[in-house]
């Protein structure tokens, strides 16, 4: 199967590898350069063009579900991506961050396999895994909580456990929600996001140890900002 055919099927990992962000991935050692070199960059007439999930008209993986782990689950990846996913696991091992590896590759992936029976949204699933809050609670109870972590797009109006979550936010006011201004440069926010996204929009933050901050921020950027201008890459 050619690269073109793979990309046309919206394989999420191939899309990342073939995007301008692949150089950033190599810089952060999440993908080896020799692997990234096998995939051509997408050429875009507008280098500043990007899109923010969810995307209307796309399938389940790109539309309503808030968990970035949908994009990492090898259940939905084609064989070429599964091999890349295996190598990505190796790269995470090399980062010597066992907590973040376990969190990404085991906890919510288990939730994903149990809760998503197909690519079609169901009325009972809404936009929240049943295990998400429990896992997040376990994470926040760790004594070494800091400002590092993983960003997940979140829509409060869609949460089916709102009361529980609001009490959760009250307990951790600084670690539950953080404004976009705190993670994106203000010039970029004003020039690129102002017409698309209100400044006050919120993104759910899964805190981790301080040493994971770069990894968490990179994951947020990869899955929620597509084709981000190189000038604003961290």
Swiss-Prot record:
One of its GO terms (biological process) is mitochondrial tRNA 5'-end processing. This is Protein rgg8. It is found in: Cytoplasm; Nucleus. GO terms for cellular component: mitochondrion; nucleus. The keyword Nucleus applies. Its main location: cytoplasm. Keywords: Cytoplasm, Nucleus.
